[in-house]
Amino acid sequence: MAAAMPLGLPLRLLVLLLVGRGCCGCAEGPRDSLREELVITPLPSGDVAATFQFRTRWDSDLQREGVSHYRLFPKALGQLISKYSLRELHLSFTQGFWRTRYWGPPFLQAPSGAELWVWFQDTVTDVDKSWRELSNVLSGIFCASLNFIDATNTVTPTASFKPLGLANDTDDYFLRYAVLPREVVCTENLTPWKKLLPCSSKAGLSVLLKADRLFHTSYHSQAVHIRPICRNAHCTSISWELRQTLSVVFDAFITGQGKKDWSLFRMFSRTLTEACPLASQSLVYVDITGYSQDNETLEVSPPPTSTYQDVILGTRKTYAVYDLFDTAMINNSRNLNIQLKWKRPPDNEALPVPFLHAQRYVSGYGLQKGELSTLLYNSHPYRAFPVLLLDVVPWYLRLYVHTLTITSKGKENKPSYIHYQPAQDRQQPHLLEMLIQLPANSVTKVSIQFERALLKWTEYTPDPNHGFYVSPSVLSALVPSVVAAKPVDWEGSPLFNTLFPVSDGSSYFVRLYTEPLLVNLPTPDFSMPYNVICLTCTVVAVCYGSFYNLLTRTFHIEEPKSGGLAKRLANLIRRARGVPPL
């Protein structure tokens, strides 16, 4: 009996460890998940838009739990949430401009350059300090110039940027928003963005993210969105959602050699070989709305796994769905090259005009005064709807608020809500928010005059004659929908439904950005200091050299020397002739 105890005790401990480990795994369940998708949309202008989204969900409360182990969720971003008490973070890098008039409403539009807006927890005491430190950290993570975000380009909107996730308190004191319109997006920003993906660029949809192809496009935008969401239907606990999105627009006539045909290999120079093994869903959607293979106008190959219909941005869409986890889709040819071919040239139809689009420009002459004008287009034939307009103007453009005019159809249009925060020289920019009602089938013009300020010579950029950028206007609106949509469960629906929030069946939310402006300021002639230095140095050198010679040299009178034998003989002959001597 005494000899059996040492053998039985380890056996019991082993059983307890195995049972405890199994029970812990059963109770905890999967704590994180990954879904990836690609939406390919032929645009009305003939271009092709491709939108990637990689959604990582982590069933963990980073604010309360001491998290030390990370599996799919990036550790760098998880530590940011914990250290700076973040509620939401939205960061985008964009090259180019989304042309709403020709490409239609965007899936996820972002302004040109870099945009960052963050909601902090209400436990943060010094929001400005956390904002500065966060922008510097993000600058290092994404190899960007976000460290140039300071008080001169940071604002706190009151109504334009509400939390997209769970929010018990919406006090705008904890919100910060900034745009760097002159930020240049390059491969150095894409590489760290891809490293945040669980499969990096080794498998799944991320193998298509080839830098030389993505930046050879008409439009390129990559973003990171972090927000808290409900873990279950009763919202008893919180999960964190990371959405990494990337949108590009290919010129079909360039990639297709003058034709509207396209394929994955032609656009990305690569094909799909396998799904990401860490993902629970990997789908490719091809927009075939308005086209049918029955009428023999186009051919989509290979045949899709299934088709899906839904109301997206107020329009009923039909998608061909390709599931990368379908063994028959990949194993037959070891690669998936989705392609669309037109059997006959498509009809040249008029481009559909979106219900809401905007345009912004600067007018005036000279370098003293000017005018900022924004045109808001409501193309709906019989529906009027309100638009929330946000303008952030640098401090060196001094706005004349009394010159603000809003006209629609030749009549004055008074905003129902207006918030203005004046600028302070070298401290904060102008902030102007207005809620404007756009009449049906109308063009509303918002204009305000400004005066250019004189900068210090140390405040000019390295290329001041190029001009100074003004961040674009932001439009937020509930646009009337053509087709009634029913709210769906975003967990049970396809992944891209989370990109397009539906408030009710009659309208949908959209956020648009206008073009960034380039304004010239009074610029001194920076070559004059060079000319003055050269002239001054020359004069000083000449004067100094002359005075130096006078002060350091000694002068002696040299006695004339008598001539030689020949000269004396010549003088004798001249005297004999009565001629003066030499």
Curated annotation (Swiss-Prot):
Protein residues bound to a 2-acyl-6-[6-phosphoethanolamine-alpha-D-mannosyl-(1->2)-6-phosphoethanolamine-alpha-D-mannosyl-(1->6)-2-phosphoethanolamine-alpha-D-mannosyl-(1->4)-alpha-D-glucosaminyl]-1-(1-radyl,2-acyl-sn-glycero-3-phospho)-1D-myo-inositol: N465, D525, S527, N531
Top-level taxon: Eukaryota
Xref: InterPro entries: PIG-T
Membrane topology designation: Single-pass type I membrane protein
Predominant localisation class: endoplasmic reticulum
TM region positions: 530-552
Any single biological process term in GO: neuron differentiation
Gene Ontology MF, one: GPI anchor binding
The record's account of how the chain is modified after translation: The disulfide bond between PIGK/GPI8 and PIGT is important for normal enzyme activity.
Location of this chain's protein in the cell: Endoplasmic reticulum membrane
Cytoplasmic side: 553-582
Biochemical pathway: Glycolipid biosynthesis; glycosylphosphatidylinositol-anchor biosynthesis
Region forming the signal peptide: 1-25
Disulfide bond residue pairs: C199-C276, C230-C235
Keyword Glycoprotein: yes
Lumenal side: 26-529
Residues glycosylated per entry: N168, N295, N331
Single GO cellular component term: cytoplasmic vesicle
Assigned keywords, A-Z: Disulfide bond, Endoplasmic reticulum, Glycoprotein, GPI-anchor biosynthesis, Membrane, Signal, Transmembrane, Transmembrane helix
Pfam annotation, one family: Gpi16
Family: Belongs to the PIGT family.
Self-association and partners: Heteropentamer. Part of the GPI-anchor transamidase complex, consisting of PIGK, PIGT, PIGS, PIGU and GAA1.
Function: Component of the glycosylphosphatidylinositol-anchor (GPI-anchor) transamidase (GPI-T) complex that catalyzes the formation of the linkage between a proprotein and a GPI-anchor and participates in GPI anchored protein biosynthesis. May play a crucial role in GPI-T complex assembly in the luminal layer. Binds GPI-anchor.
Protein's name in the database: GPI-anchor transamidase component PIGT
UniProt organism field: Mus musculus
Recorded name of the encoding gene: Pigt
